[in-house]
Amino acid sequence: MGQRLNLVFWIFVSILAFLNFGMASKIGICYGRNADNLPSPNRVSELIQHLNIKFVRIYDANIDVLKAFANTGIELMIGVPNADLLAFAQFQSNVDTWLSNNILPYYPSTKITSISVGLEVTEAPDNATGLVLPAMRNIHTALKKSGLDKKIKISSSHSLAILSRSFPPSSASFSKKHSAFLKPMLEFLVENESPFMIDLYPYYAYRDSTEKVPLEYALFESSSQVVDPATGLLYSNMFDAQLDAIYFALTAMSFKTVKVMVTESGWPSKGSPKETAATPENALAYNTNLIRHVIGDPGTPAKPGEEIDVYLFSLFNENRKPGIESERNWGMFYANGTNVYALDFTGENTTPVSPTNSTTGTSPSPSSSPIINGNSTVTIGGGGGGGTKKWCIASSQASVTELQTALDWACGPGNVDCSAVQPDQPCFEPDTVLSHASYAFNTYYQQSGASSIDCSFNGASVEVDKDPSYGNCLYMIAPATDGFNRTMAGNITGNITAIDSPLASPSSTNEAFRQMVVAVSVLLPCFVVCSSIW
């Protein structure tokens, strides 16, 4: 009897191991908030769910953001900013209080799975490397008290500059000046089965060495390969070469088994005059090819088939970030919700992307294209469903005072995102109250259901059947809906109108069915064997 139970037990263990082995690499998104006029966290959560993104990185533990992701199933990586490292490292009580206030009230409804302690501390001007490990240990102690030390992983993200050399990959090594910091931190990661977090940016390597690095090599578009003379390994793209450099550096320090997670990678869509490769076309090409590579062809030349999790940087352009122009233009979306370029996050679209090698950087403008994700669409600008299309605009007969009063209400209590009519935004010109009010009135009208009563504004507005959009200023239009679609009131922004229900997207349904078939095909023989045993 005991032998039979043991046999059944090990059969099921083997099955679970097999199913776990088949798990795919993961694509996540970085949700930075160093910008003005971003959509509310609730609206951002809606957008991320629609895009079917299951993994999100934030850079603090903002309560409003944590609440917005509650009960979504999205796995959240939260951050401890560099400015908080001293307090976290000095006193356990500080960390205990932080955990009690910022984590425990929202967990597990908000699925927090990891904490990144500090951001690229080796490159920070205040040199806070000595604070990272004490802070990590205090966080681990606090999590252990709450029984969460096995459920929430702790690590710290680094830039590639932590290496003293990165090419050829086999000769890569960590900088000696960081060895005193790295070795005990890596021991902590091994002890707690946490990943080594690295931010990889082939863009910077290309920008700083355009005469040596082909753009195609940085964009996953190269038809030739670079050889590592020591190993003979061939590299067709820079991302793999950078990632293998990390693997080799870890091996050189006797930490070969540490899992690596890429916590940032992306490409800017706009840059300074000298950053000619910072274009929307190249950003789309890099991120599209990165997703396809990670999902469809996992691993690197040194570690073929190795599962690797990658977080794309970033969801939004962040206009408050200091530095050169490209620093503020890594996002897939503008702050007003229009897409900088339409990225397929699934990796299933095989349409070729066309990078550009322009001699002058181009300035991306808000797109009027739908954002396609599988078979679901977010309609941008003057799209919409069937039936008579109507818009609500400001009446030319209304006084400036009446228009301004109604505009202030729409952008305030009316909950309209009016960032599109701010300076340097697509609907700022013409800079008149009549024009700005028209945009705000229509956004409120469409978000509220596009009924005549929603276009009253005390007589300061009128309904029209001609699309008032002009240039890059796109007016929302609410599409016709049926039992399978839903119109969002208080949507992502004035330019995102409606989304198919993300509750059962075709891609997720197909994947669930595929996994079920695999499970049944493996379990069924087991049941036959088990029946014969009994």
From Swiss-Prot:
GO cellular component, one term: side of membrane
Lipid modification (GPI-anchor amidated serine), residues: 507
Enzyme Commission code(s) on record: 3.2.1.39
Membrane topology: Lipid-anchor; GPI-anchor
UniProt keyword Cell wall biogenesis/degradation present: yes
Alphabetic keyword roster: Cell membrane, Cell wall, Cell wall biogenesis/degradation, Disulfide bond, Glycoprotein, Glycosidase, GPI-anchor, Hydrolase, Lipoprotein, Membrane, Plant defense, Secreted, Signal
PTM comment, free text: Contains two additional disulfide bonds.
Gene Ontology MF term list: glucan endo-1,3-beta-D-glucosidase activity
Classification via SUPFAM superfamilies: (Trans)glycosidases (SSF51445)
GO biological process: carbohydrate metabolic process; cell wall organization; defense response
Biased composition (Low complexity): 349-377
Catalytic activity: Hydrolysis of (1->3)-beta-D-glucosidic linkages in (1->3)-beta-D-glucans
Taxonomy, superkingdom: Eukaryota
Protein's name according to its UniProt entry: Glucan endo-1,3-beta-glucosidase 12
Carbohydrate attachment residues: 127, 336, 357, 375, 485, 491, 495
